[in-house]
Swiss-Prot record:
Subunit structure as annotated in this protein's UniProt entry: NDH-1 is composed of 14 different subunits. Subunits NuoA, H, J, K, L, M, N constitute the membrane sector of the complex.
Main location class: membrane
Protein name: NADH-quinone oxidoreductase subunit H
Entry-linked HAMAP family: NDH1_NuoH
Length: 355
């Protein structure tokens, strides 16, 4: 019996009928705290990694090797005043930052950390994740409109156009996963990648979806970078022409909430990519399966997050028209064609996804 099973059994005996509610709240709080810590140190890792790419040290003053820098940043933002523009719509202006964070946290309800370790093991988990993660753009639009600033509103309009352009391609990439796994349940999708010719010979990583669905994997991940408004797709903020886009009139913790949502969404995109295409908690080789599955999931997510940062440090920012062209004229045709190819592949004698 695992530690969580022991706690669950002991709590049920102690609190009786109230325990399921208490246990659900405890699990939600634990996941939320872990995500917040991951965001804090993801920002530090980003600054460190980009510093090394620039041949400099990065943050190294607060605490040993700069490890307390995230805490100093949080304290600074907590102490800053939230200054509201006089022409802004008060309540919408204040609600918008909260609306960006809530969907980012809500997606974690269906992401499995390892077998049987998920907050809500729902059968439509993939559909839920895609629907919830798409809501955040409405908060960006709301922030741009409520600020009553032409720069903020222009950034919000860019966010809407960018979301529409890349959401369709992401949707088709996820349709391919649904076709091959035959389920919308994220745990079952991971399970569908744990069998096949290569998995039977102990080489698990060659049975994961990244290999047969490589175009969809690339489209999904690059579209995820665009959906999170990360460099080189950060025209929503557009420092060179619209200063900071929808965030230009925000300060203090209201400003910090937008960045919190951005980094949580980075982790969400990486976690979903690892779950859908990289085997989730599955070990790359059978002889390593004794290591807890959550370790492999964290390792894959960390690697994908490092790619996020590497892309930021490497590529110049695209023009707005180039971003639209990539979404509509490259990614959308590629995913549609690959849906057709995989459909015929599954109906042929060469079908590798036979259950």
């Amino acid at each position: 019996m695992s530690l969580f099973d022991t706690i669950n059994a002991g709590g049920a005996q102690l609190l009786g009928i109230a325990w399921p509610t208490v246990w659900a709240i405890v699990r939600i709080l634990v996941v939320a705290v872990v995500i917040l810590l991951c965001v804090a140190y993801l920002i530090l890792w980003e600054r460190k990694l980009i510093g090394w790419m620039h041949v400099r040290l990065g943050p190294n003053r607060v605490g040993p090797a700069g490890l307390l820098q995230p805490i100093a940043d949080v304290l600074k933002l907590l102490l800053k005043e939230v200054i509201q523009p006089s022409a802004a719509s008060r309540w919408l202006y204040l609600i918008a930052p909260v609306m960006t964070v809530v969907p980012a946290f809500a997606v974690w309800a269906v992401i499995p950390f390892q077998a049987e370790a998920v907050l809500a093991n729902v059968n439509a988990g993939l559909l839920y994740a895609m629907a919830i993660s798409s809501i955040g753009v409405y908060a960006v639009i709301l922030a741009g409109w409520a600020s009553n600033s032409k720069y903020a509103f222009l950034g919000a309009m860019r966010a809407a156009a960018q979301m529409v352009s890349y959401e369709i391609s992401m949707g088709f990439a996820l349709v391919l996963v649904l076709m091959t796994a035959g389920s919308l349940n994220l745990s079952e999708i991971v399970g569908s990648q744990q069998h096949g010719f290569f998995a039977g010979h102990g080489v698990n990583f060659l049975s994961w979806n990244w290999l047969p669905l490589l175009p969809a994997f690339v489209v999904y991940f690059v579209s995820g970078i665009a959906e999170t408004n990360r460099h080189p797709f950060d025209v929503v903020e557009g420092e060179s022409e619209i200063v900071a886009g929808h965030m230009i009139d925000y300060s203090g913790m209201a400003f910090a909430l937008f960045f919190l949502a951005e980094y949580i969404n980075m982790i969400v995109i990486s976690a979903l990519a690892a779950t859908l295409f990289l085997g989730g908690w599955d070990a790359p080789f059978e002889f390593l399966s004794f290591i807890p599955g959550v370790f492999w999931l964290v390792l894959k997510v960390f690697a994908l997050l490092s790619v996020f940062i590497w892309v930021r440090a490497t590529f110049p920012r695209y023009r707005y028209d180039q971003i639209m062209r990539l979404g509509w004229k490259v990614f959308l045709p590629v995913t549609v064609i690959w849906v057709v190819v995989v459909g015929f592949w599954m109906m042929s004698p060469l079908n590798i996804w036979v259950k």
